[in-house]
A protein has these predicted regions:
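Short, charged/polar, Gly/Pro-enriched secondary-structure boundary elements
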Residues: 68-75
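Long, low-complexity, charge-rich intrinsically disordered regions
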Residues: 75-110
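A short, conserved structural fragment
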Residues: 47-58
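Short helix-capping/hinge SLiMs at alpha-helix to coil transitions
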Residues: 14-20, 49
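Short amphipathic alpha-helical interaction segments
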Residues: 34-45
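A short acidic, leucine-rich amphipathic alpha-helix
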Residues: 24-31
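Minor-groove-contacting beta-hairpin "wing" of winged helix-turn-helix DNA-binding domains
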Residues: 58-66
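Short alpha-helical segments that sit at the start of domains
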Residues: 1-11
């Protein structure tokens, strides 16, 4: 675990227990002196690689999961994001395929 990951983990684990104590990434960045990009990458690594129960919401920020209800809410929000990204990916793929067909038709007409 990196120094920044340890700093973030200790802060969230001790000061952000439960959704009611969540901190936005902007405020955490200021409090911990870690730029926002690095903060996001570290939190992702803490959850993904180190399996730490750190949740995030688009409005409240980052927090340490404190109960089953918070886990369920965090899980539902992640699944919602996954579905939206999947739909975006599908739109991108279909749009690209359509644009290739238009170009092919234009070339045939020449």
């Amino acid at each position: 675990m990196t120094d920044n990951e340890l700093i973030i983990l200790n802060y969230i684990k001790n000061r952000c227990r439960g959704k009611q104590h969540a901190e936005t990434f902007g405020r955490l960045s200021l409090l911990l002196g870690i730029n926002e990009r690095e903060l996001r990458l570290c939190v992702a690594e803490l959850v993904t690689h180190w399996q730490q129960p750190i949740a995030s919401t688009s409005d409240a920020g980052y927090y340490w999961l404190n109960c089953d209800d918070e886990y369920q809410q965090a899980s539902n929000e992640l699944m919602s994001r996954i579905r939206k990204l999947s739909m975006r990916h599908k739109g991108l793929r279909l749009g690209y395929m359509k644009s290739k067909q238009v170009i092919t038709k234009q070339l045939v007409m020449l």
